[in-house]
């Protein structure tokens, strides 16, 4: 299973998190048996078949399953150092740890790689492997957990070989970007795109260790 994402557009209920599967019909049947039923009729995602899942069974998130891998998007020609190389991780703000574990682990079958609480950050973080990237699910410590409130899509982190080079290129193109700063994880560098990505909190992350994903 791998992941792609369609950013929210005007009039949309929210970002659509799309999970790519080898056998769409089998994946839809399995999701339904696990309490994650399809929502409405089959549609398309580009030239591929797509089935939305019921947000009421997914903590309020807009999820879908799509068939096959399909071609990627073409990228502009830029130097390797100043290029964004891949999506590193997707961040979800959750309201209930048990609900998040049930959705991403039990129902969707993603591999839980790490579950930790960090009082200094005021957060519990769960990291699920999804293809070549990571789903980071965050709960705020000190807040009562509830299933009465929906979970939220909370942003994207893109991977780059040289955060300073990418920040300089984007600033030169007129994007409103922050200064590059050290990340929370040792050996990382990060900056924020303040504007230019509608509705979507976005950061660019340099992993000096060269590993894929924010956490093992």
Residue ranges of predicted features:
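Short, flexible, glycine/charge-rich loop motifs used to bind or transfer phosphoryl groups or to couple energy/partner
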Residues: 80-81, 145-147
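Vicinal oxygen chelate
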Residues: 1-84, 86-96, 117-136, 146-171, ...
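A mid-sequence, solvent-exposed acidic-amphipathic segment
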Residues: 85-143
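N-terminal beta-strand motif that seeds the catalytic metal site of vicinal oxygen chelate
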Residues: 12-19, 64-101, 107, 153-156, ...
């Amino acid at each position: 299973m791998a992941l792609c994402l369609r950013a929210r557009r005007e009039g949309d209920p929210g970002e659509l998190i799309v999970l790519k599967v080898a056998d769409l019909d089998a994946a839809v049947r399995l999701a339904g048996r696990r309490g994650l039923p399809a929502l409405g009729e089959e549609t398309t995602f580009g030239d591929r078949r797509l089935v939305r899942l019921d947000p009421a069974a997914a903590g309020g998130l807009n999820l879908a399953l799509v068939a096959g891998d399909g071609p990627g998007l073409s990228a502009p020609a830029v130097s390797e150092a100043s290029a964004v190389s891949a999506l590193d991780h997707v961040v979800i703000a959750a309201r209930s740890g048990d609900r998040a574990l049930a959705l991403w682990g039990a129902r969707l079958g993603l591999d839980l790689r790490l579950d930790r609480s960090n009082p200094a950050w005021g957060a519990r973080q769960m990291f699920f492997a999804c293809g070549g990237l990571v789903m980071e699910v965050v709960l705020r410590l000190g807040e009562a957990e509830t299933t009465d409130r929906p979970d939220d899509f909370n942003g994207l982190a893109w991977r780059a070989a040289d955060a300073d080079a990418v920040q300089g290129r984007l600033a030169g193109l007129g994007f409103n970007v922050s200064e590059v700063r050290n990340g929370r994880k040792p050996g990382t560098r990060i900056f924020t795109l303040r504007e230019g990505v509608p509705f979507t909190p976005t950061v660019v992350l340099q992993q000096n260790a060269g590993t894929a994903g924010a956490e093992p």
